[in-house]
Amino acid sequence: MNKARAIARWISFLLLIAAGQVCAELQVQISQGVEGAIPVAVVPFANQGSLSDSLSQIVSADLQRSGRFRTLAESAMQERPTAPDQVQQAAWQALGQDFVVVGQIRPSGDGYEADFHVVDVIRGTLVVSYRLPFGRAETRQAAHRIADVIYKAITGEPGAFATRVAYVSVSGEGANRRYNLQVADTDGYNPQSVIVSNEPIMSPAWSPDGTKIAYVSFESRRSAIYVQTLATGERRKVSDAPGINGAPAFSPDGSRLALTLSKDGNPDIYVMNLGSGGLTRITDYSGIDTEPNWSRDGRSIVFTSDRGGKPQLYLVSASGGPAERLTYEGDYNARGVFSPDGRSLAMVHGKGGDYRIAVMDLASRAVRVLTSGPLDESPGFAPNGSMILYAARRGQLAAVSIDGKVRQSLRIEGGAVREPAWSP
């Protein structure tokens, strides 16, 4: 296969970017929650007036947005306790609550401290007490961290409210089209532009410490891979080899980058040492090998290949060698990504022209379809493994729990967003 044909096939294989008019923030909606969601009341924290109200409202919204909780409206609260010993167990039981969150905010140095408590009003026990310092400009982030503490205290699982989401938004038409790589809180607030370009931006990937993003940019009218530091905006071009430069993925320790290059003819998987720039070729196939993703121990790489005739997922050692085919069910399986516990893979699963998000158990190889399609793509796990974020049709993002019981939609008014990536 010549290089021009390889590039054309690769672009048709990967590029699915929709256009639209972009507004400032993602809007998050719960489209389906858990039946029997846990009732919890987040009482407005005492002191500091509007700051306390705002913080409590964000915490309550986070818990409600997870689909795992049903939060009590502030207007339905008959009392406003600020400490555990003020919580009247029977009164909250009468309101149908299982848990009550109370707290106070106090000035501390140049910022504040939030002292909060989670009370189990069914058992009459204190579940957790926590003190969180935060800066004057960090109210939203502090609220997300508080929601994480509450989520873990009640469910036993880590929360993911304080993480962030990267995505590509597209605006304008023709010569006025703009591609914007953005990072926002998981509730859609605080969007920040990483880079804006007249040419496509693709495949954002977080570093394991959450400080950098690797991405593909066509700003020079051909693909190149950059790594950008979010705090400073400093970026480094790490690959602009002839032909395809695509699908970057950081190794678990952040020292290496798996990527797709066609510099030697066809798209194959390579691993780059980010310190030295040295390249190791991992696959050598006459068709297309692309979309690498690392196992959690850094020893293996899952990738998409058409070597069996149609796109399927394969597993190869991170040092190279023979590849093992993982998927057989369906006409199309691509964009494989390991779960945080390493026990399963999320992927795009195609059958009969519909493309849906599915999860495969790596031990049994059983596949469970989680979404309804018909054009779902780009799955990625939340860092706690509870949800999968993906791109759906009509330029919106969506999220589904790994058991399929909780569903969220994330959209921009009148616009399009693609290529989501959840931060560590």
From Swiss-Prot:
The keyword Cell cycle applies. It is found in: Periplasm. InterPro entries: 6-blade_b-propeller_TolB-like, PD40, Tol-Pal_TolB, TolB_N. It comes from the Bacteria. Keywords: Cell cycle, Cell division, Periplasm, Signal. Residues 1-24 form the signal peptide. Its main location: periplasm. It holds the Pfam family TolB_N. GO terms for biological process: cell division; protein import. One of its GO terms (cellular component) is periplasmic space. Belongs to the TolB family. Part of the Tol-Pal system, which plays a role in outer membrane invagination during cell division and is important for maintaining outer membrane integrity. The Tol-Pal system is composed of five core proteins: the inner membrane proteins TolA, TolQ and TolR, the periplasmic protein TolB and the outer membrane protein Pal. They form a network linking the inner and outer membranes and the peptidoglycan layer. This is Tol-Pal system protein TolB. It comes from Methylococcus capsulatus (strain ATCC 33009 / NCIMB 11132 / Bath). The lineage of its organism: Bacteria, Pseudomonadati, Pseudomonadota, Gammaproteobacteria, Methylococcales.
